[in-house]
């Protein structure tokens, strides 16, 4: 069966870059590596005492800290899968690095404005990346969209914390 032909009789150029076929081994290795990096980062943060202040009033919808850590591990597994599935791997690595930096700009500065700005930039990048890779790998786009959804939740949580405890700027 022949492909579509243009007026010149040649196939039109492909605009969408397609990723190379993904083997199970590469998929598993990238997932394991990203989860390991996230787990090591979470462990280091816990060992260094990077915990939110206990004096804050938390909104009723805030999940326990352990749940947040588990969700991030699952999200990093999804980003690892997206890294293996998407053709634009550098862009996925940038998202992974932005998410690894998340605890540092949220807790290190203890500043609601910094948290919001970081969330907005990370959210905008995640949405852009999901839209960019959606034709390369719809599954990778779904994994990245899950990160964006969680960042929306985190942003709502930051706004609620600021409202309940006063803005720290």
Language-model features: locations:
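Short aromatic-rich membrane-water interface segments that cap or initiate transmembrane helices
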Residues: 58-71
């Amino acid at each position: 069966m022949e492909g579509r032909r243009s007026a010149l009789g040649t196939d039109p150029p492909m605009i969408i870059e397609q990723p190379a076929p993904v083997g199970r081994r590469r998929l598993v290795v990238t997932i394991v590596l990203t989860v390991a990096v996230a787990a090591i980062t979470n462990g280091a943060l816990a060992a260094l005492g990077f915990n939110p202040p206990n004096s804050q009033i938390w909104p009723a919808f805030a999940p326990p800290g352990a749940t947040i850590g588990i969700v991030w591990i699952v999200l990093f597994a999804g980003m690892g899968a997206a890294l293996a599935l998407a053709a634009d791997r550098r862009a996925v690595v940038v998202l992974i690095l932005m998410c690894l930096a998340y605890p540092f700009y949220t807790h290190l500065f203890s500043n609601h404005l910094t948290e919001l700005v970081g969330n907005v930039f990370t959210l905008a990048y995640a949405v852009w990346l999901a839209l960019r890779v959606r034709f390369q790998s719809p599954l990778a786009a779904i994994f990245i969209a899950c990160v964006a959804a969680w960042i929306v939740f985190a942003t709502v949580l930051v706004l609620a914390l600021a409202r309940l405890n006063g803005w720290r700027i």
